[in-house]
């Protein structure tokens, strides 16, 4: 085969959505394995790599999986990320203990670590065991407030697998007041621009409104800076692709994530379309709670 094999490890709290995520990935063309013995992962990857035109590989595991020892799994991941024939990503599905308890009670299923104790006690015990993997994971999705269809849509948007020659680009806006998006590859701070929030008739508008865009472009050096950012991004995208990186997330931030970052993200997405890309646009502080949860835990307002 030529190029790198995409390998996605899907783990997290029991009841947080691992099975749902794997079903979506299978529909997207990934080869999926659930509760696959950890000790067999490297041989399995070798077998997949030896085949012609292998599909990307998604492997699900959790505290019930045979050979599950978090620190040993992390050491395995450290070895795998050093390889030049694959690209490894770890996805951790999280959820609040209270919501997990509600889900287990609603479905009348027993939590795997609740033998001889309450479901909530089992959930808390599992959370302690899983914490090292949560810290290791590049991608964390909190499913506490997500319906199944919302989680499915997030997985489709983030992990759809195109032809190796193509590239999935996400352009997003966010507010620093709620923390940076942990999945972003490139982050641009737009707080050097004058803030429309302090203009009374623009405060309740957003970067999607023409008046906000006119205000931003009429003041300062937006056009010059934007062109430099555009040139940098267009120069980096093919270099990322050459290194086997199929997904690139470009994020623009401002204080509240409603004006400057939104306008810049929309303008950059249009520039990328004109350059032949088909970017996905996400406005974290404007979008549904689904997109908000995908980006990571909320910070203080």
UniProtKB/Swiss-Prot annotation:
Keywords recorded for this protein, A-Z: ATP-binding, GTP-binding, Nucleotide-binding
Molecular function GO labels: ATP binding; GTP binding
Binding site for GTP: 62-65
Residue sites binding ATP per the record: 12-19
Residue runs in coiled coils: none
Highest taxon above the source species: Bacteria
Role this protein plays: Displays ATPase and GTPase activities.
Family: Belongs to the RapZ-like family.
Name used for this protein in its record: Nucleotide-binding protein ELI_02120
């Amino acid at each position: 085969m030529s190029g790198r094999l995409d390998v996605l490890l899907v783990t997290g709290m029991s009841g947080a959505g691992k099975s749902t995520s794997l079903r979506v990935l299978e529909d997207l063309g990934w080869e999926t394995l659930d509760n696959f013995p950890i000790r067999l992962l490297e041989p399995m990857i070798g077998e997949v790599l030896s085949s012609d035109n292998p599909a990307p590989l998604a492997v699900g595991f959790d505290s019930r999986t045979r050979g599950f020892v978090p620190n040993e799994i992390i050491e395995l991941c450290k070895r795998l990320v050093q390889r030049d024939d694959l690209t490894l990503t770890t996805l951790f599905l999280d959820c609040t203990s209270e919501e997990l308890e509600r889900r287990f009670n609603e479905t009348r299923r027993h939590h795997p670590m609740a033998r001889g104790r309450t479901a909530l006690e089992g959930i808390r015990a599992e959370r302690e065991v899983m914490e090292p993997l949560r810290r290791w994971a590049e991608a964390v999705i909190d499913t506490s407030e997500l319906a199944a269809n919302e989680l499915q849509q997030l997985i489709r948007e983030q992990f759809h697998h195109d032809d190796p020659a193509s590239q999935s680009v996400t352009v997003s806006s966010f507010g620093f007041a709620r923390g940076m998006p942990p999945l972003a590859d490139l982050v641009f701070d737009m707080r050097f621009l004058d803030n429309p929030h302090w203009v009374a008739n623009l405060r309740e508008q957003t970067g999607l409104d023409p008046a906000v865009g006119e205000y931003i472009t009429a003041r300062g050096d937006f056009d010059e800076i934007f062109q430099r950012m555009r040139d940098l991004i267009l120069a980096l995208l093919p270099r990322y692709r050459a290194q086997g990186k199929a997904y690139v997330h470009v994020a623009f931030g401002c204080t509240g994530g409603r004006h400057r970052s939104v306008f810049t993200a929309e303008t950059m997405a249009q520039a990328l379309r004109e350059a032949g890309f088909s970017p996905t646009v996400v406005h974290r502080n404007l979008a549904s709670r689904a997109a908000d949860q995908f980006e990571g835990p909320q910070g203080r307002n």
